[in-house]
């Protein structure tokens, strides 16, 4: 199996979030639990719209964020300052998957780069450093935003329909990621 996100079933831990069971990588759950035991607040970073990502995959990421919020606020009064600090301390922001030159993702979405940005490649597979490539690199200024193609249309490298992707991104940007779980 290539690096495609496959995880052996015994490498998963089931946790209930908003009344539904989700399977999370045991290493991630254990890391969060060990951080609390050590008095450290770890920070997970999230990326959405990777090639192959579906809405169900994104829901699992969102559920893990919500599980962390519940974990860090367990036993605290929602009105308390400590609850608010712990809840806000869980990173609920997400980057949008971005194909940077030289990365594995760049190679995976090469045909999309040609279609969306008119990027050309030489016979060795390297991008031709012309105006199209330069404009693409300028578009990479902020990985939290949605890339727009040469026509100004949004680009989604994942498997979600564009309308779904844009709605999810809207929920992330508005700080209402829990709404993704309801989609």
State each model region's role.
Residues 1-183:
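A structural motif corresponding to the C-terminal lobe/cap of the Radical SAM core domain
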């Amino acid at each position: 199996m290539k690096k495609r996100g496959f995880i052996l079933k015994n490498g998963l831990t089931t946790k209930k979030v908003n009344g539904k069971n989700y399977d999370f990588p045991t290493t991630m759950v254990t890391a969060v639990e060990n951080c609390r035991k050590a008095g450290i607040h770890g920070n997970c970073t999230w990326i959405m719209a990777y090639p192959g990502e579906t809405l169900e995959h994104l829901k699992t990421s969102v559920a893990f964020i919500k599980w962390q919020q519940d974990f860090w606020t367990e036993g605290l009064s929602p009105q308390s300052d400590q609850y608010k600090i712990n809840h806000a301390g869980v990173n609920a922001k997400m980057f949008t998957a971005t194909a940077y030159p030289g990365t594995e993702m760049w190679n995976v979405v090469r045909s999309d780069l040609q279609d969306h940005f008119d990027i050309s490649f030489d016979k060795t597979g390297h991008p031709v450093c012309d105006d199209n490539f330069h404009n693409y690199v300028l578009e990479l200024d902020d990985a939290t935003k949605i890339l727009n193609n040469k026509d100004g249309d949004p680009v989604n490298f994942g498997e979600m329909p564009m309308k779904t992707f844009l709605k999810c991104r809207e929920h992330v940007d508005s700080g209402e990621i829990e709404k993704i779980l309801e989609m």
